[in-house]
């Protein structure tokens, strides 16, 4: 079944290239997320500029565009190595979307969706790690960074044959969060609650 893998890689990249943040903002009449808030076309920034409804729509779509190509390839018996490349292709599409001038998001939700087909137990642990980190720290970026660092160890525990491809995916996410890591180190990163509070104050004026 690995013969179909190259085609699945292309399909995954094209799926990832559909920027739901930009499309949802256009449909909802919201500012372009690439030019507003943090400038990142992802669910967290849409939450800041458009509220919960728009952000949830973006989050679900971003998860699905990582999940569906990998799940399809997994069902067809594609080997773990190729599954890893398919997952990375979906994230690359999200980060550098061919349909939107190669300016995309950071790939966290798409990566989460790509990992989900490995198992619901792993999915639950990953989601719990991200949520707990965000609740304790207030930093969405830190939640993504911690989850990416721990993901290979979780996968090794649940299904070790997928450790290498998930490690590749984690490296991509960490590289994409390079600027966030620097801001966290310098204590210059803004907490998500602070930005939401500012938005509410602005809306009430």
UniProtKB/Swiss-Prot annotation:
It catalyses: sn-glycerol 3-phosphate + an acyl-CoA = a 1-acyl-sn-glycero-3-phosphate + CoA; a fatty acyl-[ACP] + sn-glycerol 3-phosphate = a 1-acyl-sn-glycero-3-phosphate + holo-[ACP]. It comes from the Bacteria. GO terms for biological process: phospholipid biosynthetic process. Keywords: Cell inner membrane, Cell membrane, Lipid biosynthesis, Lipid metabolism, Membrane, Phospholipid biosynthesis, Phospholipid metabolism, Transferase, Transmembrane, Transmembrane helix. GO terms for cellular component: plasma membrane. It holds the Pfam family G3P_acyltransf. Pathway: Lipid metabolism; phospholipid metabolism. Its main location: membrane. It is a multi-pass membrane protein. It is found in: Cell inner membrane. Residues 25-52, 102-111, 159-205 are cytoplasmic. The chain crosses the membrane at residues 4-24, 53-73, 81-101, 112-132, 138-158. Probably interacts with PlsX. Catalyzes the transfer of an acyl group from acyl-ACP to glycerol-3-phosphate (G3P) to form lysophosphatidic acid (LPA). This enzyme can also utilize acyl-CoA as fatty acyl donor, but not acyl-PO(4). NCBIfam families: glycerol-3-phosphate 1-O-acyltransferase PlsY. Belongs to the PlsY family. PANTHER family: GLYCEROL-3-PHOSPHATE ACYLTRANSFERASE-RELATED, INNER MEMBRANE PROTEIN YGIH. This is Glycerol-3-phosphate acyltransferase. It comes from Salmonella schwarzengrund (strain CVM19633). The gene is plsY.
